[in-house]
Every structure is written in C-alpha cells, then in structure tokens.
Amino acid sequence: EAESSSSASTSTITTPQKVGSEFQVNTYTAGEQTKTNIASLSGGGFVGTWMSNGQDGSGEGVYGQIYDASGNAVGSEFLINSETNNNQDHPSVTGLSDGGFVVAWESTGQDGSGDGVYGQRYDASAAAIGVEFKINTHTSNEQRDIHLASLEGGGFVANWISYNQDGNIWGIYGQRFDSSGNAAGAEFRINTHTANNQQHAQISSLPD
C-alpha cells in the first residue's frame, strides 16, 4: 500500500491598515517645509527629516523630529545642520543598528565650491554625536543628491552625484563609513560608463 500526498503553497496578502489619524510632522509652519524623509529606528520608533525655508535664519535648513513606537513625538523638532549660511537642503536619513541615526544633506558653498554633501550622526535620544562632517572628498563644482543606507555592524554608506568629476558632466560617487562615523577607505566612482550624465541613483544595503 502506498500513500500519496500533495500540498500547495499559498501566500496571503495582508491589506495595510491605518493606525490612528494622519499627523503634522513639522511644528514650525512659517514659509515652506518640504522634502521629508523618514527612517525606522531599531527601538520601534522612527525619525522624520525635512527642509524648512527661513527657519534657521538663512535660506533653507534641515530639521528633524523623533517619534516613539506609538507614533508620539519625542521632544521637539530640532535643527540638524550646524552651518546655516546659504542653503542646507534635500536631506536623507537612515537608522543605525545602535538605535541612532545619521542624516545627510546638500550645503551650498560650505566646501568652497558650489554644493557639497554633509552629515551628522545622532544617538537614539537625538543627541548629536560629534560635529557635522563633510562626506565628499572631491569638492570642485557640485556634489548633491545624497542618499544613505545603513550597514550591518553599525556603519553606513552614502552615494551622491558629482559634476565633471569623471570628466563628463554628472557621475555617481560613494563613500563607506564605519560604526564610529569614520570614512572607511576613499570615495569611489560607482558608474563605469561616463559619457553624458549618470545621476538619480538610489542605494540599499545587502544582508551580506
């Protein structure tokens, strides 16, 4: 006597359910608050960042707000960029494995030549760790459109576009950082093909 059995694999798609009502992230409302970016935190909460016009006294500035796992604001919104001259805008944020997070943004004129990209690390309570730091090594012309991704072990990686660094309009560059926020190696070109423009890149970490 032989027994035969068969099974079918099924998957269930769960319909997302809203939790509570929509809420306003920014407290300061004069001018414009735009370009928001959100990252989850390892403790169950999340952090929102955005750029705000005129709030820091000089053009655009970058601000943030922490939320707990229940969606309640933790503390007040806070200014992220220390340099306030000209514009600091278009932020990117990623959570880190230690419960903190890192924010990066474009800053006009700070590196001495057009836009550069800068960052600031925070602990889980939104206290700044160290001072803001320049991410791009090459400073000629423009470096902008910064994106971040966290890495296993507590580090993170950034990518951005740089004007004429590869010899032909826009190219895409990256830089790794260790868990202490120190650059790990040199910045590197990501695109191999350099004719015309390479831009609008995204970044994601892999489990290995």
Model-identified regions with their sequence ranges:
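Extracellular glycosylation-rich, acidic/polar low-complexity regions of adhesion-
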Residues: 1-14
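Extracellular, repeat-based ectodomains that mediate carbohydrate processing or recognition
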Residues: 13-208
